[in-house]
Amino acid sequence: MIERGKFRSLTLINWNGFFARTFDLDELVTTLSGGNGAGKSTTMAAFVTALIPDLTLLHFRNTTEAGATSGSRDKGLHGKLKAGVCYSMLDTINSRHQRVVVGVRLQQVAGRDRKVDIKPFAIQGLPMSVQPTQLVTETLNERQARVLPLNELKDKLEAMEGVQFKQFNSITDYHSLMFDLGIIARRLRSASDRSKFYRLIEASLYGGISSAITRSLRDYLLPENSGVRKAFQDMEAALRENRMTLEAIRVTQSDRDLFKHLISEATNYVAADYMRHANERRVHLDKALEFRRELHTSRQQLAAEQYKHVDMARELAEHNGAEGDLEADYQAASDHLNLVQTAQRQQEKIERYEADLDELQIRLEEQNEVVAEAIERQEENEARAEAAELEVDELKSQLADYQQALDVQQTRAIQYNQAIAALNRAKELCHLPDLTADSAAEWLETFQAKEQEATEKMLSLEQKMSMAQTAHSQFEQAYQLVVAINGPLARNEAWDVARELLREGVDQRHLAEQVQPLRMRLSELEQRLREQQEAERLLADFCKRQGKNFDIDELEALHQELEARIASLSDSVSNAREERMALRQEQEQLQSRIQSLMQRAPVWLAAQNSLNQLSEQCGEEFTSSQDVTEYLQQLLEREREAIVERDEVGARKNAVDEEIERLSQPGGSEDQRLNALAERFGGVLLSEIYDDVSLEDAPYFSALYGPSRHAIVVPDLSQVTEHLEGLTDCPEDLYLIEGDPQSFDDSVFSVDELEKAVVVKIADRQWRYSRFPEVPLFGRAARESRIESLHAEREVLSERFATLSFDVQKTQRLHQAFSRFIGSHLAVAFESDPEAEIRQLNSRRVELERALSNHENDNQQQRIQFEQAKEGVTALNRILPRLNLLADDSLADRVDEIRERLDEAQEAARFVQQFGNQLAKLEPIVSVLQSDPEQFEQLKEDYAYSQQMQRDARQQAFALTEVVQRRAHFSYSDSAEMLSGNSDLNEKLRERLEQAEAERTRAREALRGHAAQLSQYNQVLASLKSSYDTKKELLNDLQRELQDIGVRADSGAEERARIRRDELHAQLSNNRSRRNQLEKALTFCEAEMDNLTRKLRKLERDYFEMREQVVTAKAGWCAVMRMVKDNVVERRLHRRELAYLSADDLRSMSDKALGALRLAVADNEHLRDVLRMSEDPKRPERKIQFFVAVYQHLRERIRQDIIRTDDPVEAIEQMEIELSRLTEELTSREQKLAISSRSVANIIRKTIQREQNRIRMLNQGLQNVSFGQVNSVRLNVNVRETHAMLLDVLSEQHEQHQDLFNSNRLTFSEALAKLYQRLNPQIDMGQRTPQTIGEELLDYRNYLEMEVEVNRGSDGWLRAESGALSTGEAIGTGMSILVMVVQSWEDESRRLRGKDISPCRLLFLDEAARLDARSIATLFELCERLQMQLIIAAPENISPEKGTTYKLVRKVFQNTEHVHVVGLRGFAPQLPETLPGSDEAPSQES
């Protein structure tokens, strides 16, 4: 059995109180006993410092304030040291019986911070006889010694044979050596690990349950599952690398697209310019020849235009002279027309106003009568209203007087007075002083008869007045008519003048009736006169155009001659037109055919390019479409064979991948069901137990266990029996072996080993012979070896698969190219060359153009002659119908005679028109002018007097009536009769008053209504008089204006004036039109001459420039062609299909490509500079240089190990194939790399279950531990609820969250974190990233919660907390937990360290007096059972029965402080033996 390593001694050099002291450590318990300040804590601090020399962790709490200021950082260490070099060394012996001394050199650093410098070192190979103090001290004399510095110590040890001295610059290296040699239980890789180790030592040193440890028990007790984490990290790294590779492929594909784009645009840019220059060179040659032809033609045209200009200038001068006369005539005719139109408008107004005046005269007379009647009625109404008013006033006065008398009993007196007043008023009005009440009735009858007589007389006068007024109105009307016609005259002359006017009217009316026939006759003669003048003008113009004068008799013969000439020229022109049409038709047919061929040529050229590419790719020549289809069949067969071979290689590669995946399973399980069964049975796979077997031993153990190499090792087979019932989900043969998985050996079988084979005696009658497998798979090393060979095979298969995939894709692309060719170009690829036919047709077209030009020149002369003859015939056709007018000489005299007669008739018509209505009105009433009614005014005065007399008689009668009515008031008999009479009179008065008021109201209403009506009649009358006067005045003004105009406004005058004006306007327009035509033609001719002159100069200049340009371009083109041929790029640039595009299209194509290229080469300085230089249009060879630079740039970027070609175009095609294959392969690899969520859950669950089992095993070691009331200690491990739900979802409901795990944007860790957040939205994740959270969730320790429980007294199991336990119980419980932690660390580190080493176990306990004797005995028992060393510090009253005890006493001797140490080893029957080195230390050298 492997012995456990032990700490032999602790050596302190130059510490406070210890100059050179070595403490031999007991194998179990070492007790440091002494009072306060004896040096117990200093000793333990020295041990801890040598064990963990990390100043960031060291913190000795009981002396922190004593040895350092507030700014100190030594945490209590500075005050424990003396000045100078100090050492703390541990002498150990490990399981291999190797002596190892490890320690630190400490030295105070001067300064206010009181820092301490620490240097760790290790010594190996030191003989057992050499003590640690002998190494670091040098004896000067019997009483003095010197501490050696570290460099002298190094030199001293190097001088000793076999001794190795190592000085460490980092604490990690120091601890790494200590771990490898078995001094510490755990490899401390980082500051975090060192902190955990220090917290453990600190917790044991000061005792109790450390909160720092209990809070992080998972980190102390649960080992980090680095394999699982590494597997996940490797998987994510592989996935990340795979995705990065895929992204790189996408980038490469974009680079490929960029290359493709660069080649395409560079080709378009340069080829378009190249073909444009080629086209322009040919065009320039054609233009030079064309310029020469145009130069000759233009000179001829200029001479013809000069002759034409002279003729038109002469004709223009003639028309300019005639235009002035025509303008004067036209202006006079326009003015005359305006006067006629004005006179007609005036005449129409006069007629309209005369009609209005007649109507107003009638209405005015009617209105006068209406107003007179209204005045009479108004006067009557006024009299009636006045009488009614007087009667009402009288009645009101009587009634008021009567009421007043009645009130004061004087009614009769009042009535009497009223009667007397009425009598007096009647006397006054009637002029009757003797009138009495009795005679009133008689006088009333007299005055009523007088009133009746006055009324009859007034009516008689009114009738006479009406008749006189009518006669007076007729005389005035007739007199006004005579005045209107003849002017002012005396009233007595009206009768004679009126008769003379009526006779003159009859004569004027007869003359007016002849106006229309005379006007028609004049119009006819004037029209003939104008036609005669037009004929004379046409004849003069014709003679001028013909260049000679012709008589009237010669015109008909000349007309026949010209018609004969037209017929002959027409035949010639017609024949020439047919011939020209035939030539043009042939030319159009040729042009159409050429256009058709030019449209077909690019398609044919594209088909030829595609056919040539196919021929180059496959190395075959195709002469017909049948050759193409036959080769396509061969290609399909070849593709089919390559696909079959690729699939076979792919299947083998997949098989290898599956085997690699199967062998890569943790624990060596090839069947996942075995892992589940092992967990279910609480066992371990046999392959997992033998996972560490070496490669050399793998064949032996594989043969030893044979088919049972995949067995499950269980602690007790009897407990598995119940699980086997109904078990179906398992392999066909399931092997179960009973044994302890922690200490399993191969003693299960009886084995005889043969050469390369074993014989296993399973039972007495059953043996099994198994040979060593050639490829063992038992153990991790064997599997890794097999995996390595499989990886090598996979690499070969992958390379072969890649090659075959490349060939298949290349064949498929070739097949696609053939398919595209067949679909797009096969119909035209093998047709005849259209360009050859185009050249033949172009030569024929040139011949036709030459023939057409000659024919046009010949036909031009005939056309000119034909136009001249046709123009002459047209002029004669207008002259010949007017020959009789040309011979009529008296036509002008007849026109003058008729015009004079028409003037007289129009004057009579104007008189009739002006005074015809007045004469018609005057004729029926002319007789009234014989006598003038002068008595009309006297009659009006008599009528007014009669009205006044009638009004006076009516008032007198009314006054007498009132007296008669009051006759009863003149006599009253007595008072009673008076009262009775008064009552009746009152009623009568009231009735009369009501009747009188009603009558007055009616009279007022009638008066008011009639007054309003009279006012309206007067207004209408005034309006009519005003309108009549206004219109009369306007009529007089219009008649005067018409006389002032001096033009006859008959019905035909306007038409004649308009016809005359239009004729002159037509002549003027024709003259102007011809003049404008001549001016325009002359201007055009001059412009044409100027243009021809400029054109001649320009043609001469262009011709010479074009010649020079052709010569210059030839040299540049030769340089371009030489560069193209030298760099072998003519095939790329000379794209014949571009020859059929226009220069603008090619320039646009080049400019678009240039814009794209600027963006494409923006990041490439060389290409950007070359492109910028190539933009010079005068240096086309620079574009070729740019194209060559692009090809060179792409050739340099072709990976020759993958793509074996120099042509970038072919390289891009091969790159596309290779990238497509890589994309497919990496995508499949990513699918294989990705681990499923269920697998993750199973791995974490299995790890949790394994660790729970391990904690249970650790708990078994603590079952018998007791301290005070604590009977037992245990650890509880539970899975957190939130994390358990996460595991359930991962294993059972993972399909609901595939959106996370199938996302390419999320790693598995990030997807896991997102799922955790989705399941637990209430938990705040803080500032942590999903990647960090996911990595934590992949650590199984974060799924567990751990807590310490104690079984204390009657409380049972409860959570271990400092407040619930006594001090001793807390110390004992904490020590038990620390022991468990140390044991857990050893188990965790067993695979990392050599198997022949068992590490040292040592813990501390300061102030152990807090434990009772039973608890201390328990600690001793625990140390013995666990082979653990323990250092205890206690007061003097502690006397352990076992172990080694040191008694420490601090003394001061001669101002020097030192610690006196006495050591005792246990209690025995003999006297205690003094341990070596227990004497007092020598004094320190000053």
From Swiss-Prot:
Location in or out of the cell: Cytoplasm, Nucleoid
Residues reported in the UniProt entry to bind ATP: 34-41
Domain of life (superkingdom): Bacteria
Keywords: ATP-binding, Cell cycle, Cell division, Chromosome partition, Coiled coil, Cytoplasm, DNA condensation, DNA-binding, Nucleotide-binding
Pfam family, one: SbcC_Walker_B
Region annotated Flexible hinge, chain positions: 666-783
GO CC annotations, alphabetized: cytoplasm; nucleoid
Coiled coil: 334-418, 444-480, 509-603, 835-923, 977-1115, 1209-1266
A GO molecular-function annotation: DNA binding
InterPro entries per the UniProt record, alphabetical: MukB, MukB/SMC, MukB_hinge, MukB_hinge_sf, MukB_N_dom, P-loop_NTPase
Keyword NAD applies: no
Database matches in PANTHER family: CHROMOSOME PARTITION PROTEIN MUKB (PTHR42963), DUF4476 DOMAIN-CONTAINING PROTEIN (PTHR42963:SF1)
Domain remark in the UniProt entry: The hinge domain, which separates the large intramolecular coiled coil regions, allows the homodimerization, forming a V-shaped homodimer.
Protein name: Chromosome partition protein MukB
Natural source organism: Shigella sonnei (strain Ss046)
